[in-house]
Swiss-Prot record:
GO cellular component: endoplasmic reticulum membrane
Provenance organism: Mus musculus (Mouse)
Inducing factors: By dexamethasone.
Names of the cofactor(s): heme
SUPFAM superfamilies listed in its UniProt record: Cytochrome P450
Binding site for heme: 443
GN (gene name): Cyp3a11
Keywords per UniProt: Endoplasmic reticulum, Heme, Iron, Membrane, Metal-binding, Microsome, Monooxygenase, Oxidoreductase
Protein's name according to its UniProt entry: Cytochrome P450 3A11
Keyword Membrane: yes
């Protein structure tokens, strides 16, 4: 007897009802935007529209922008995402209603002690961290940190010269990733790591393990589809970040703190010391004015997580753009040579005042915003431009799509630093150019990142020119990863300039 005839009518009815209920549960929120006339791709039961992310976030957002216009609706599982591109609406989300409604970023799973990190923390806790950490990013503090970073620029130049002598093409991410890692670990943890020449250093290995982050990781994917799993994972002590790396950095910060507290010598200015000062200067160590040891560790780790990929990738994209636009490269070198004759050592003020360098970097950040999107969670039911958004929903700003919108940028796919000249940048709407976000919850490390990248580019351009080679992908194609990456590693020929910098 086959299975069909073996089951009674009642069983079939019960099965049909169960399937209908399961379908209704898996689509229970998917009518939210349709009822309000908001267009968007058709969501699948339980999955919503997340399968489209396999195209690449940047590509999917561009497709939606072209197809649906200024506003569209998506679903990460059951979580509604309202995509907005109108500058005034973006201003409302990022600035005007930041504290009242759109304070927080999205949860992305169980994070352990990293819930204390400024990028992940929420509401009053985030405000406290922001108030405590903002003074560490003033121009005065960055100027004091400049010599710490410059030494790694010298190591980078020396390494590139060795590679150039061999005449072999150089994979940019390998070299610039090591530079980025060294600068961040030095300023965040107070440790000197030469990862260019010591790639197997335990500190480097633990940091790189921390950075192996995949948007399509099963753990993250399960939380996106079923947010209620986050507290379950937390109870089971499951964490998105590798526990051995977190524990390693926690012990390291403890050791560095003890060493600096025991020593009577004046310590160099870096983020670790500045965070320790906020802790030590507080009269009440348990008050909101003091950063705890755990909080210091979380901030140090998030500096690696937030700074490594963005800095190394942006520098790689910049050098590819310069190599494929030799006239722009020459103009940048001329500015640097004029500001720093005879390859004089850069100073903070000189680097930050070079106009064309700023234009080149800004244009790279427009073409290649490493974070494709900005997202904010609604803390309460709200109406935004006539659209009802329930509490817990996400408002998404597709920064890559905005940066490539021909309504805002002429020939948006072309590398044109002149867009950011003194004459032109005043006409750029600050809510369609968002490489670091905007408003109170923008990137706290923006000034540090810009200084770091400008110093690296200055040192590099003083000493080398870059040219395409047979391994260079032209035009550059982008991968489908969560953060913006080239489809193939950027490989360029490094050509030493005539003069040689002494001591490098």
């Amino acid at each position: 007897m086959d299975l069909v005839s073996a089951l009674s009518l009642e069983t079939w009815v019960l099965l049909a009802i169960s399937l209908v209920l399961l379908y209704r549960y898996g689509t229970r929120k998917h009518e939210l935007f349709k009822k309000q006339g908001i267009p968007g791709p058709k969501p699948l039961p339980f999955l919503g529209t997340v399968l489209n992310y396999y195209k690449g976030l940047w590509k999917f957002d561009m497709e939606c922008y072209k197809k649906y216009g200024k506003t569209w609706g998506l679903f990460d599982g059951q979580t509604p995402l309202l995509a907005v591109t109108d500058p005034e609406t973006i201003k409302n989300v990022l600035v005007k209603e930041c504290f009242s409604v759109f304070t927080n970023r999205r949860d992305f799973g169980p994070v352990g002690i990293m819930s204390k990190a400024i990028s992940i923390s929420k509401d009053d806790e985030w405000k406290r961290y922001r108030a405590l950490l903002s003074p560490t990013f003033t121009s005065g503090k960055l100027k004091e940190m400049f010599p710490v970073i410059e030494q790694y620029g010298d190591i980078l130049v020396k390494y590139l010269r060795q590679k150039a002598k061999k005449g072999k093409p150089v994979t940019m991410k390998d070299v610039l990733g090591a530079y980025s890692m060294d600068v961040i670990t030095s300023t965040s943890f107070g440790v000197n790591v030469d990862s260019l020449n010591n790639p197997e250093d335990p500190f480097v290995e633990k940091a790189k393990k921390l950075l192996r982050f995949d948007f399509f990781d099963p753990l993250l994917f399960s939380v996106v589809l079923f947010p209620f799993l986050t507290p379950v994972y937390e109870m089971l002590n499951i964490c998105m970040f590798p526990k051995d790396s977190i524990e390693f950095f926690k012990k390291f910060v403890d050791r560095m703190k003890e060493s600096r507290l025991d020593s009577k010598q004046k310590h160099r200015v870096d983020f670790l010391q500045l965070m320790m000062n906020s802790h030590n200067n507080s009269k009440d160590k348990v008050s909101h004015k003091a950063l705890s040891d755990m909080e210091i560790t979380a901030q140090s780790i998030i500096f690696i997580f937030a700074g490594y990929e963005t800095t190394s990738s942006t520098l790689s994209f910049t050098l590819h753009s310069l190599a494929t636009h030799p006239d722009i490269q020459k103009k940048l070198q001329d500015e640097i040579d004029e500001a720093l004759p005879n390859k004089a050592p850069p100073t903070y003020d000189t680097v930050m005042e070079m106009e064309y360098l700023d234009m080149v970097l800004n244009e790279t950040l427009r073409l290649y915003p490493i974070a494709n999107r900005l997202e904010r969670v609604c803390k309460k039911d709200v109406e935004l431009n006539g659209v009802y958004i329930p509490k817990g929903s996400t408002v998404m700003i597709p920064s890559y799509a905005l940066h490539h919108d021909p309504q805002h940028w002429s020939e948006p796919e072309e590398f044109q630093p002149e867009r950011f000249s003194k004459e032109n940048k005043g006409s750029i709407d600050p809510y369609v150019y968002l490489p670091f976000g905007n408003g109170p919850r923008n990137c706290l490390g923006m000034r540090f990142a810009l200084m770091n990248m400008k110093l690296a580019l200055t040192k590099i351009m003083q000493n080398f020119s870059f040219q395409p080679c047979k391994e260079t992908q032209i035009p550059l194609k982008l991968s489908r990863q969560g953060l913006l990456q080239p489809e193939k590693p950027i490989v360029l020929k490094v050509v030493p300039r005539d003069a040689v910098i002494t001591g490098a």
